[in-house]
From Swiss-Prot:
GO terms for molecular function: rRNA binding; structural constituent of ribosome. Belongs to the universal ribosomal protein uS19 family. This is Small ribosomal subunit protein uS19. InterPro entries: Ribosomal_uS19 (IPR002222), Ribosomal_uS19_bac-type (IPR005732), Ribosomal_uS19_CS (IPR020934), Ribosomal_uS19_SF (IPR023575).
Amino acid sequence: MARSLKKGPFVDDHLMAKVEKLNETDKKQVVKTWSRRSTIFPQFIGHTIAVYDGRKHVPVFISEDMVGHKLGEFAPSRTYKGHASDDKKTRR
């Protein structure tokens, strides 16, 4: 279900403040965040944001195509190791 248009996009205030501070000083630093729920804004373009996936921070370089998506979409939190193998082949 999509978010209501009257509410607008969500971004954590502390993350937005960090990115705006970097934009004012023209620095390119990695910003660590645990906020997977934040929407990517146009101000984030060109920055690298390290998004926490439950074990480590995954660096995500923000490009124009990512605007409007959530940060958590680019840092998968689950590792898929395949289905369990079928042992019928080894029994023969």
